[in-house]
Amino acid sequence: MKNNKFIFPLLTILVFFSIFIYALLMTWPVSCNHMNQYVTIKKNSSVNQVSKVLENNLCVNKNLFKIAIKLTGNDKNIRYGRYNFKSVTNMKDLVNLLTSNNKEKVKITVIEGLRLKDVAIYLEKKLSIDINHFIELCYNKSFISSLGINASNLEGYLYPDTYLLLKNYTEKDIIRVMVSQFLYNYNENILKNKLTMHEIVTLASIIQWEAIYDDEMRLISSVYHNRLDRNMLLQADPTVQYILPERKSKLLKKHTRVDNSYNTYLYKGLPPGPINSPGIMAIIAAADPDQSDYLYFVANNKGRHIFNTTFKGHLKSKK
């Protein structure tokens, strides 16, 4: 009987201690500069293999992860795939992300060249987001700054790619994932450049709109670089299309006279910002153009372009 008096308090202490340790482990911070990248978990990976991948690619303590995954009973539930960890803040988030059933996830594909509003419409259909809140966030300067982007809005920075997102992701979560993917791909491919990131993305968005074929992007880029170097108007049709209420099959002179800072028929230099979300090929082309003397180009009936060094030659190609 005397022993029983000590057993119950001891068990109570052990229970509370266990709860405390569990809570401490689940809320253990998981955050570092590398969380914005994608990491692939291979099919049939063991807990040990996954823990090593997380420790090698992210700042995750492999031993703490192994304890957490086993304590939650999820050591057999890790799902393979390509993950972005930007929304992960603690060990609980990490375990949930890696063990959530794919039925709780939605696969989305954002194609190159979509405008911000078109991305929002697409996400509303696929994920039932609050489209107004999403767009508001994309224009929220403090939120944009927190993402590491120096721009007035996120036009051009919602990276076109295929994503596997949890259904319960908030609008902020989705934006963070897309911008993180942009930054990762940009920093992996673009070294120091005479243009700023914002200028490169802005030019890339024009190239993305102009080019149907990737192999023409760097040559198209050279035309714009040559015109910028000569202080010529860019006269880029996509910048005019961007400011019109609806896209025109053919631009008329009256369209090119619309007074707007994005209109490169009226204002020299690059427009204030991107006009769509360019893909990595267009971004690379904007940063590293071909070397040429071309100043003009026009599309033929197959979507290819004819390039010229003189306006006279350009007019001839347009006929």
Q: Where are the predicted features?
A:
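Bacterial extracytoplasmic/cell-wall-associated proteins, especially those involved in peptidoglycan
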Residues: 121, 125-132, 143-319
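Short N-terminal secondary-structure initiator segments
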Residues: 15-19, 36-43, 102, 233-251
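Hydrophobic membrane-insertion alpha-helices, especially the h-region
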Residues: 9-23
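Signal peptide-directed extracytoplasmic domains
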Residues: 20-186
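Positively charged n-region of N-terminal signal peptides that target proteins for export
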Residues: 1-6
